[in-house]
């Protein structure tokens, strides 16, 4: 799996919003709460021109959105001719004052030149996920975990949660707990300052990024 922690803010303050984009190949995209419940996405024009100051946003279409502070999960699926469908599974930490969007972007021209692609790239818009954070996105960063899988090679992750991190110093501290199907648990802590002492559950670290893997009581990675 892959971990993406994206912090963003204006140095001078006065942040209006910060947007996180992710594009993936495929014909279908399913955006729900992390527990699988519906977010009740509704059609929207909110992304159009990004409030009249980013005109490239006008290329997005079929936009739907929901305002939610819940953790979410998005699955992008390539429907393969041999039915061994390939998926990219994304879990993202929720935050107050956040909106999530599903949308379509223009097709990906470069990939259309690759031979033996599983579907007609030029005829398929690009699946697009957007998360919009009102205000700063430094102390409320975009935190995502990505895992590819297929029908014949299912993913290893059974759940992703985002436990709170305690620290005696104010800062952008992130906790991630990744439970795998074979019993391994990976705990991750990230801080915007490697000098800050951070604690989450049984894990205490002083680092910008630290991972502790444990399988059935045995430490397997630090």
Give the location of each predicted region.
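A structural signal for short secondary-structure junctions
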Residues: 9-16, 23-24, 121-125, 134-139, ...
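Short amphipathic beta-strand/extended segments with alternating polar/hydrophobic composition
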Residues: 19-21, 87-94, 101-105, 183-195, ...
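Generic recognition of flexible, low-complexity loop/linker segments
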Residues: 5, 60-62, 75, 118, ...
């Amino acid at each position: 799996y892959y971990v993406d922690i994206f912090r963003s803010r204006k140095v001078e303050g006065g942040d209006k919003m910060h947007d996180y984009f992710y594009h993936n190949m495929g014909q279908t995209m399913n955006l729900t709460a992390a527990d699988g419940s519906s977010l009740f996405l509704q059609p929207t024009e909110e992304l159009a021109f990004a409030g009249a100051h980013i005109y490239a946003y006008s290329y997005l279409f079929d936009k739907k959105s929901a305002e939610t502070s819940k953790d979410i999960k998005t699955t992008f699926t390539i429907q393969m001719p041999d039915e061994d469908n390939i998926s990219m599974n994304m879990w993202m930490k929720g935050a107050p004052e956040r909106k999530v969007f599903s949308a379509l972007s223009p097709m990906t021209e470069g990939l259309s030149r690759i031979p033996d692609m599983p579907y007609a790239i030029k005829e398929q818009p690009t699946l697009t996920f957007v998360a919009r954070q009102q205000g700063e996105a430094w102390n409320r960063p975009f935190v995502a975990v990505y895992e590819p899988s297929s029908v014949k090679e299912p993913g290893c992750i059974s759940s992703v949660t985002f436990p709170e991190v305690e620290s005696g110093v104010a800062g952008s501290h992130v906790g991630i707990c990744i439970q795998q199907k074979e019993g391994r648990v990976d705990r991750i802590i990230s801080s915007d300052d490697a000098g800050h002492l951070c604690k989450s559950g049984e894990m205490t670290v002083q680092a910008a990024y630290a991972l502790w893997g444990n399988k059935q009581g045995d430490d397997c990675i630090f």
